[in-house]
A protein has these predicted regions:
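Polybasic, positively charged surfaces/segments
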Residues: 1-371
């Protein structure tokens, strides 16, 4: 919930920047096949989720309202035991689902066995082509997952965990994934991989700000395209560049008071500190909002109360934020919990405090503009 992956696109360049094609086109229906073996389950053909922001996992769109990602045991434990104080700040969890790969005449499709009771409450439409075609972004991305994450070996089904799609029905979803992690968490037994992970923290804004941008996509009015920044870009920029990128994302087009966003971050931080069930070695904050088209170009950073040429706010319902990616969240009851150093138990505090302080600075700047 950190790079961005969009359907039917070229792979990002070395600078981490991708221009996204013009938005438009009809949705494709998710095909439902009769299930003769399990009366209570439906067989749904899945698509690669076009608007994945952040992470390296294979995220699939099950229906218009549901997405899923490969199941990590630590994340499954967290979602099944979310402390009440954190529930308003995490995506709606829909349980586990079995995903398998079918190949017919050289063409692959991914299928999920989903409870019919869940499907009845969901719209069975998804964006994009569900067949993993040659040259299609879905094929490139999913083949990477199959090779590097060892998914669907020997055509065996894989366990995924399923969530509500936070941007269902969005027209132009803008999203930002911020990874909170000041120090490398140490949860890797492979020495070479451990070194790479340590360098990611030491050589990025994780070490200076306590967070780094893992991915962002934002709508450009001038070009009518999405502008995308992936995790490699986020690891290559300095503190000043991060702040400028945040200023763009949380500018007036987000449709929400920056103070409100900052206060929500503070509330999330307090909720994490006050819960006693889990230790957060690393986690991500996902910010998202929808953009409406306007007739005229508007500045990116002006007082939030300003309206567009039609007297309307250009964003729908404002910017929202959720905690995501709980693979590095450890139950306090874990038998090795006592081995975790105190500075790692407080690993997200520095970053989330800095982030809210930066947004408070934006709010003060807005106040000066108004005056």
């Amino acid at each position: 919930m950190t790079c961005v992956y969009l359907g039917n696109q070229h792979q990002p360049g070395s600078n981490g920047l991708v221009n996204i094609e013009e938005i438009g086109g009809d949705n494709s229906k998710v095909q439902m096949e009769p299930d003769s073996t399990e009366d209570h389950e439906g067989d749904v053909i899945c698509c690669a989720f076009r608007h994945q922001v952040g992470g390296h996992k294979c995220v699939l769109q099950v229906t218009e309202n549901l997405i899923c990602k490969p199941c990590e045991e630590s994340e499954r434990i967290f979602y099944n035991n979310v402390p009440a104080i954190l529930q308003p700040y995490v995506p709606g969890y829909r349980g586990e689902v079995s995903v398998y790969c079918k190949e017919n005449g050289g063409h692959k499709t991914l299928h999920a066995k989903v409870s019919k009771s869940i499907l009845r409450s969901c719209r069975t439409y998804a964006d994009g082509n569900c067949e993993i075609e040659e040259g299609n972004w879905g094929k490139t991305r999913l083949n990477y997952c199959i090779k590097n994450e060892s998914l669907w070996k020997n055509n065996s089904p894989e366990k995924f965990i399923m969530f509500d799609n936070l941007i269902a029905n969005f027209e132009r979803p803008c999203a930002l994934d911020i990874k909170l992690c000041r120090y490398y968490h140490g949860m890797c037994s492979d020495p070479s991989k451990k070194l790479v992970l340590e360098q990611k923290c030491n050589n990025s804004t994780s070490s200076t700000l306590g967070f780094r941008i893992g991915g962002m996509q934002i709508y450009q009015h001038e070009t009518r395209k999405m502008l995308q920044f992936n995790k490699h870009y986020g690891m290559s920029i300095n503190d000043h560049q991060v702040i400028e990128l945040l200023k763009i994302f949380f500018g007036r087009r987000s449709g929400t008071s920056i103070r409100d966003i900052s206060n929500t971050i503070k509330n999330i931080h307090n909720a994490v500190l006050n819960q006693k069930d889990f230790i957060f070695l690393s986690v991500s904050l996902l910010f998202f909002y929808d953009i409406q088209e306007t007739q005229h170009s508007v500045p990116l950073f002006q007082p939030e109360a300003d309206l567009d040429a039609k007297g309307q706010n250009p964003a729908k319902a404002g910017c929202k934020v959720r905690l995501i990616d709980f693979e590095k969240v450890i139950p306090v009851s874990d038998e090795e919990e006592h081995l975790i150093p105190q500075h790692l138990k407080e690993n997200i505090n520095f970053g989330i405090t800095n982030l809210s302080n930066i947004l408070d600075g934006f709010a003060i700047e807005n106040d000066l503009i108004k005056d």
